[in-house]
Amino acid sequence: MQKIRRDDEIIVIAGKDKGKRGKVLKVLADDRLVVSGVNLIKRHSKPNPMLGVQGGIVEKEAPLHVSNVAIFNAETSKADRVGFKIEDGKKIRIFKSTQKPVDA
């Protein structure tokens, strides 16, 4: 079970976007995440009239390493760590500071 999953609210704790918050769009296999509005890069794209694609400078999210983010606890309004607990025979994720489930 992964500590950070798709649609989790996270906060960046290291790097150029430190302090920014966003929602996880995609979790990649090599411990990297794509987060909405964080780690934006600019890419130049050629126009393709056959596909109807207009050229120009496109801004998109680049992946960042999972060690540079922490899950955001809305109750405490701070970054938090994730732990696991077995409840009713199921393994659930909990916030370490409040011991409450993440997926509540």
Curated annotation (Swiss-Prot):
Pfam families: KOW, ribosomal_L24. Keywords: Ribonucleoprotein, Ribosomal protein, RNA-binding, rRNA-binding. InterPro entries: KOW (IPR005824), Rib_uL2_dom2 (IPR014722), Ribosomal_uL24 (IPR003256), Ribosomal_uL24_CS (IPR005825), Ribosomal_uL24_KOW (IPR041988), Translation_prot_SH3-like_sf (IPR008991). Gene3D superfamilies: 2.30.30.30. GO terms for molecular function: rRNA binding; structural constituent of ribosome. GO terms for cellular component: ribonucleoprotein complex; ribosome. One of its GO terms (biological process) is translation. Transmembrane segments: none annotated. One of two assembly initiator proteins, it binds directly to the 5'-end of the 23S rRNA, where it nucleates assembly of the 50S subunit. One of the proteins that surrounds the polypeptide exit tunnel on the outside of the subunit. Belongs to the universal ribosomal protein uL24 family. Part of the 50S ribosomal subunit. NCBIfam families: rplX_bact. This is Large ribosomal subunit protein uL24.
